[in-house]
Amino acid sequence: MEDKMLLYIADQMKHRIADMEDECPKLRIDIANLYYLSGMKAMGYSDYATSRSYFKVALSLLPTDRWVSQYKLCRHISLKLAKSIYSCGDVEEAQSILHEMLEKCLSIEDKLPVQALLVTSE
């Protein structure tokens, strides 16, 4: 999918996100993946404010038990969200996400990139 098309679809779907609370969990995960990819594209353009927005929407679409049922996706989104937020200059919010990640990550390998970003943000 072309970058512009992906970002266009994500932007159009934002208008309906609030209505998605009762949608099928699988659909919500698929849309969270779309927003994750959109956030990655925005990061690739160094548009951290936009990537921050996409990653926040992606995280909001995951179920409340996201650290159990969607561990890998949640970890990826959370780390990219923290990087985007940090790049926007909101160090405290980024650190808050990183501290939550340290509590939730299951392995040392998963915690290493979190620790690395946390060290650079302090």
Show where each model-derived region lies.
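Extended alpha-helical scaffolding segments used for macromolecular assembly and cargo binding
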Residues: M1-E93, I97-T120
